[in-house]
Structures are given as C-alpha cells and as structure tokens.
C-alpha cells in the first residue's frame, strides 16, 4: 500500500492544465493513485447536449457502513494572461513558504491532502469499520440562453 506526501501530490496535480472542462489526463492519474491505496475506482463521463463532456471519478475503500464521502474538484479557471504571472501557473513553485500554481488554493491541494491522509489512515487501519469514498469532479458549465 502506498502512502502519499500531500505537498508532492499537490505539485503533481498542479502540473495538469485542467482549465474547465478539460480533463488533461488528471482523472486517470487520480485513479492510478487511488488504486495504489486499495480503492476500487470508476471514471464516469457526463455530457449534456452540445456541451463538452466532463469526467468524474468515484472510488471506494471498504464496503461497510457508515460511508465517509469527500467531494473535491480538480478543474481550474483560466489563468488569464500568462505574462501577468511571476511563474508558469502550471509549474508548481514554492515561494516564501507558499505553494504557487493554478489550483494550489482551490482545490487541488485539498484533494491531495485528502488522498495523503487516507493513504496514511488505510496503511494503519487495514480492517476499519465503514468505507471511504472520494469523488473528484470537473465542473460542467452550461451556456446561458440569451434573451
């Protein structure tokens, strides 16, 4: 069973240019990491009309109740003009003790911290009562109708 470091995993997630609704391979990446902990996983794809499809991942560790479910998104808003950034927004940087990059504060670091915490918990509690289900998703933004 793999135990993950939250900062290292957050840096890896920031490298994915997951500007809504682009997946950029992050769901497959997360699936691989979760399977190393022992999760059963399923990537789900959703499409509404003419919109671009979005991918979500559902994973579950354990089969009993109660179930603890954590939901977090891994898409980011566009970075805008790259020239306005002091560093590449998809190249994680530590500056003055802070992690800088697209998704560092919303919410790739949170997803990374959850996975790291669960990996540590699962390594120490192989037969815990209940189950854990992280759900990671990208946002589906539908165009508004003009009036």
Question: Language-model features: where?
Answer:
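Acidic/His- and Gly-rich active-site-bordering loop/insert found
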Residues: 2-100, 123-129
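Alpha-helical metal-binding/catalytic segments enriched in His/Glu/Asp
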Residues: 70, 99-137
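Conserved small/polar residues in nucleotide/adenosyl-binding loops
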Residues: 138-144
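Short, well-ordered, mixed-charge alpha-helical segments that flank or form enzyme active sites
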Residues: 78-79, 108, 140
């Amino acid at each position: 069973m793999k135990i993950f470091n939250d900062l290292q995993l957050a840096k890896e997630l920031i490298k994915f240019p997951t500007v809504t609704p682009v997946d950029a391979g992050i769901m497959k990446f997360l699936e691989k990491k979760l399977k190393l902990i022992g999760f059963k996983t399923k990537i789900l794809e959703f499409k509404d009309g003419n919109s671009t499809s979005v991918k979500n991942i559902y994973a579950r560790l354990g089969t009993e109740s109660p179930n603890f479910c954590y939901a977090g998104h891994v898409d980011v808003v566009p970075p805008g003009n790259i020239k306005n950034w002091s560093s590449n927004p998809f190249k994680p940087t530590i500056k003055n003790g802070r992690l800088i990059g697209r998704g560092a504060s919303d919410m790739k670091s949170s997803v990374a911290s959850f996975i790291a915490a669960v990996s540590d918990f699962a390594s120490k509690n192989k037969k815990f009562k209940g189950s854990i289900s992280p759900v990671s998703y990208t946002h589906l933004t539908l165009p508004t109708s003009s009036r």
